């Protein structure tokens, strides 16, 4: 008799703009067979579950429902998008105290349910909240992952692709560091077809100010979107579904994620964006990119900023931790 595999189950916590976009992307791509959604607005979740299920005749079969924390017990993946949204004029780090308290109220009941899967944190500031999820949950580092600089890297690929007239998927590029103002592109590596972007810029009569222009455009893109429409959700919702797919399908894929530093880049005791390999068991490998002295200094400055804000927030909120 053929062995019947257990359906892959995902619990989404947070049914706002990002969460619902993530859920829709999961439905469209047929990622996981079961999707439970948790939010304090229970009636809204029930409506979303019905609405999402209406798409399944043209996509993929999926059991979608309004869930409770008890449903996390046998889930493979818990995705956290819940939190106060970033408002015009706010940085992601401005959200930390509000969202740290919200996060604590989520992680505790998930752990108490008997959950033994993987946490994927998407809520902002994602690096700090991912580290907090690890500390609050007591989980191993390989089972707590943040979306990190996945969206920022995608934005960088988009901008470079437009400049060089190539498909963004053909752009080999990374943004590292905080998912926020101190993030930076790795120009010593970033390339298209093996030709460094920095060399392409020079060959086309531009100077290094073009690289700074690209950096600023990518770093400021979220602020531009928020000022124009109030929130960002299509990009991050789709990127988060891509990460979930890589984990659930055991793809062993390299993605720029927020992962725990254990000496990489000389950093310890924080989560920050760097390429990492993920699969069915979560984090499999952290890839430490070789950086120039200038890039290393930017990584250290980004980490320092995160650490200062994080330590202050933990002290002010008094969030209880297991490790």
Swiss-Prot record:
The modification Phosphotyrosine is found at residue 223. It catalyses: (S)-lactate + NAD(+) = pyruvate + NADH + H(+). Coiled coil: none annotated. One of its GO terms (biological process) is lactate metabolic process. NAD(+) binds at residues 18, 39, 69, 83-84, 105, 122-124, 147. One of its GO terms (molecular function) is L-lactate dehydrogenase activity. The active site is at 179 (proton acceptor). PANTHER family: L-2-HYDROXYCARBOXYLATE DEHYDROGENASE (NAD(P)(+)), L-LACTATE DEHYDROGENASE. This is L-lactate dehydrogenase 1. It comes from Lactobacillus acidophilus (strain ATCC 700396 / NCK56 / N2 / NCFM).
């Amino acid at each position: 008799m053929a062995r019947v595999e257990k359906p892959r189950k995902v619990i989404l916590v947070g049914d706002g703009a990002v969460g619902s976009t993530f859920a829709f992307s999961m439905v469209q791509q047929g990622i996981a067979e079961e999707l439970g959604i948790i939010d304090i607005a229970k009636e809204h979740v029930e409506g979303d579950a019905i609405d999402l299920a209406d798409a399944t005749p043209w996509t993929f079969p999926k059991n979608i429902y309004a869930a409770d924390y008890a449903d996390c017990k046998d889930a493979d993946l818990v995705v956290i998008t819940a939190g106060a949204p970033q408002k015009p004029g706010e940085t992601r780090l401005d959200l930390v105290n509000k969202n740290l308290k919200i996060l604590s109220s989520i992680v505790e009941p998930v752990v108490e349910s008997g959950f033994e899967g993987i946490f994927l944190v998407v809520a902002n500031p994602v690096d700090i909240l991912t580290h907090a999820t690890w500390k609050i949950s007591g989980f191993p580092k390989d089972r707590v992952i943040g979306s990190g600089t996945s969206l920022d890297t995608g934005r960088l690929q988009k901008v470079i692709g437009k400049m060089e007239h190539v498909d963004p998927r053909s752009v080999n590029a990374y943004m590292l560091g905080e998912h926020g103002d101190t993030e930076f592109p790795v120009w010593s590596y970033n390339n298209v077809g093996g030709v460094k972007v920095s060399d392409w810029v020079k060959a086309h009569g531009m100077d290094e100010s073009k690289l700074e222009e690209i950096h600023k455009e990518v770093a400021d893109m979220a602020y531009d979107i928020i000022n124009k429409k109030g929130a960002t959700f299509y990009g991050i919702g789709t990127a988060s579904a891509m990460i979930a797919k890589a984990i659930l399908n055991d793809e062993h894929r390299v993605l720029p994620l927020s992962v725990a530093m254990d000496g990489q880049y000389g950093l310890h005791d924080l989560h920050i964006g760097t390429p990492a390999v993920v699969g069915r068991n979560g984090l499999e490998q952290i890839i430490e990119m070789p950086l120039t002295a200038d890039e290393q200094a930017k990584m250290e400055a980004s980490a320092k900023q995160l650490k200062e804000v994080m330590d202050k927030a933990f002290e002010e909120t008094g969030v209880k931790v297991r490790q």
